[in-house]
Amino acid sequence: MSRYEASDIEARWQKAWEEAAIFQAKEDHSKPKYYVLEMFPYPSGKLHMGHVRNYTMGDVIARYKLSTGHNVLHPMGFDAFGMPAENAAMASGGHPKDWTYSNIDTMVEQMKPLGLSLDWSRMFATCDPEYYGQQQALFLDFLEKGLVYRKNAVVNWDPVDMTVLANEQVENGRGWRSGALVERRELTQWFFKISDYSDELLEALDGLENWPAKVRLMQENWIGKSRGLQFSFERTDGEEAIEVYTTRPDTLMGASFVGISPDHPIAKKLEAESQEVADFVAECRKGGTTEEAIETAEKLGYDTGLRVKHPLDPNWELPVWIANFILMDYGTGAIFACPAHDQRDFEFATKYNLPIIPVLEPVEGAGELTEAYVPTKAEKVRYVRGFAGDELQTGEEGVNTAVDKAEAEGWGQGVTKFRLRDWGLSRQRYWGCPIPVVHCPDCGVVPEKKENLPIALPYDEDGKAIDFSVPGNPLDRHPSWRNCACPNCGKPAQRETDTMDTFVDSSWYFARFTAPRAETPTDLDAANYWMNVDQYIGGIEHAILHLLYSRFFARAMQICGHLPESAKEPFDALFTQGMVTHAIYENAERKDDNGRAIYHYPSEVEERDGGVFVKETGERIKVIPSAKMSKSKNNVVDPLAIISTYGADTARWFVLSDSPPERDVEWTASGAEAAYKHLNRVWNLCDRIGEMDPDAKGEGDEELLREMHKAIRDVTLGVESFGFNAAIAKLYGFTNTLSKSKASAAVQKQAIKTLAQLMSPMTPHLAEDIWAHQGGEGLIANAAWPVADESMLVEDSVTLPIQVNGKRRGEITVAKDLDKAEVEKLALAHEAVQRVLEGAAPKKVIVVPGRIVNVVA
């Protein structure tokens, strides 16, 4: 019997696929098209098991669709711009471009052994000038259509590194790299007008039936449509009133103070007049700028001394506070605070000893408030200081009646607002797509001409290497790149040195794959043929920003003529896979020099004597339950090591078999070993059947064929519904049946070839080898998917339970169409029934065809 040599088999069939170019997609209008896409990776230089699981899922779908007669597009590329490359250049003195392309080469070499059915001829990286040049063309088209604009915006500014920081780069108010106190600085930034599409993006979610409900809900909440009241508080000093927007006008009678953002015009005026206010506002500008960062920061306030009049009682005056938790870019930058029913306001009022006035309470009554009472708008509550509607009503009813009252009395207006803000795309970074505009002293901001694209990044400073360790954006200090002629008047001008947010790069790549070498952003004919993406696969962490931005981009590209109307929703179906996890191995006997835990790689430990120990030192290990694979915890498994030991098919089989794909899967050495043993078993089964006399007769042909067609039915259903683990469970069962079968050689040969076809999306190399050994025609990757014979799925026999006086005594298997009288005879002849009857005749026998036999003794 030959040995299952995974490495030889896999290399041989990968070469065969490449030579046959069977995965290179070409337009073919005689077939239905199918576009499957996994979210493309960042080129970190290291493939991990999460990648393996993600790409294997997509590969199963792609191979299945190819075998069912579809023309499949299954491309791969790299999301290659971003900070890690600049950070690597800072650390090593290298160049982001060299680091990135080296990592891409490495990752391609790591991916290819997996045997993925990818069209590598379409590969690109977003840092390719050919790609980002077309992205610059899109920017210019968007600018022409009014979808891009400039405005001042508050950003996180690192005064040492002299750059804008993303919120996640601000740690405890300091820059993550420099350690400098971060400032909230106002800079001129470029924005996409995504907020113009808030309603459309929200309404269209209902049509995304093949997206997970939780993703649609996350996007709905992010877009954040709300109906509220906009009104003004008159100032007691007679100056301009303070306009506020609230989604809970029903709590207005619990107003304690009016809060304004540190960036509100009133705050800015006071800042210019008072050093004390200026110092306070400067303190507020330390830390992040997102809602999340502000929400978790300590609540800070400053009493301006200004007072306003309550709109329902001119004798009721409220203080005006500057508060660090109020955002200028939501609503009006001013709020009225009701501490009794907003936790943020409650914490602020408690800290500064401001009134807390309950307006509503649970229907059953309330005790002393120790935190804000914040019921949902759907809950019915008791209004104890209401001013509109009934005493008992839902919050939503209270809001609506409050808005109606304000409008009727003329002091407020019902307004619908969205949480979704315009998308700021400016980044003060080198390693990104340059924004294609020029600043001219005479003409102002001028779009670059398309014939001058791409505006490529300079590799060096006119022959001198760029020093990435110097703070700031290298493009700002470049001796020549920044200088150019104005596209409008031809006079000396300067290029924009900001680059685009890397989310821009990933917001249209799916469209570029349809014609990756086109000299325009898309080829409309190719886009018409291939779009939409039929199946998109990726992590839940991209549920909001990437997917929302892509939906916006598809609409903008359609407006500009780069996509058809039908592609406004670019992803027909979305699947979000779970993570690959692994146990964490913490050294139980010592810490590092800084007192921190020491974690060991799985390859460094061994199980023995009822415990887990470090192989080299024998130190005891504390095993922490499975968690997401993480370099910081060393609980990572190298896919290449697994492929080297067991083969790619084993890795593919295991990540698909052990858990439903939407859930996490725990990687274990024993699980991988079990998967490998099973594939060996299938290989040996193929060998055994191949050695049979082709004319050998047997018994049980029909039974084996029936099980084969059941397997076809069940595996097909599993693959089509993303139930890969269920499909594999059926394949285990069918393998067991075949290994025990005594059917004829011809039927067993048919069964093993069918087994190979059913396994081919999951274990394509092994399947190809079995197919070839059993005389299959051509490549199994090109073979038509087997179709279950419905007549073979109809059972000829049925097993009926027998009950005597209501108690189950046994069962009989009979022909499905057997006469009732014959069924009764067989039931009464059953040994267990005879023991109960003790020779007496039964009082009654009831035969329910196909279900049960009831005997009354």
Curated annotation (Swiss-Prot):
Cellular component annotations (GO), alphabetically ordered: cytosol
Location within or outside the cell: Cytoplasm
Subcellular location, principal: cytoplasm
Enzymatic reactions: tRNA(Leu) + L-leucine + ATP = L-leucyl-tRNA(Leu) + AMP + diphosphate
Keywords for the protein's UniProt record, in alphabetical order: Aminoacyl-tRNA synthetase, ATP-binding, Cytoplasm, Ligase, Nucleotide-binding, Protein biosynthesis
Keyword Zinc belongs to the record: no
Entries under InterPro entries matching the protein: aa-tRNA-synth_I_CS (IPR001412), aa-tRNA-synth_Ia (IPR002300), Leu-tRNA-ligase (IPR002302), Leu_tRNA-synth_edit (IPR025709), M/V/L/I-tRNA-synth_anticd-bd (IPR013155), Methionyl/Leucyl_tRNA_Synth (IPR015413), Rossmann-like_a/b/a_fold (IPR014729), tRNAsynth_Ia_anticodon-bd (IPR009080)
Motif 'KMSKS' region in this chain: 628-632
Binding site for ATP: K631
Domain of life: Bacteria
Gene3D superfamilies, alphabetized: 2.20.28.290, 3.10.20.590, HUPs, Isoleucyl-tRNA Synthetase, Domain 1
Example of a GO biological process term: leucyl-tRNA aminoacylation
Gene Ontology MF, one: aminoacyl-tRNA deacylase activity
Chain ranges for the short sequence motif 'HIGH' region as given in the UniProt record: 41-51
Pfam families hit by this protein: Anticodon_1, tRNA-synt_1, tRNA-synt_1_2, tRNA-synt_1g
EC numbers, comma separated: 6.1.1.4
Root EC class: ligase
Similarity field: Belongs to the class-I aminoacyl-tRNA synthetase family.
Cited NCBIfam families: leuS_bact
HAMAP family: Leu_tRNA_synth_B
Name this polypeptide is given: Leucine--tRNA ligase
Name of the gene encoding the protein in the UniProt record: leuS
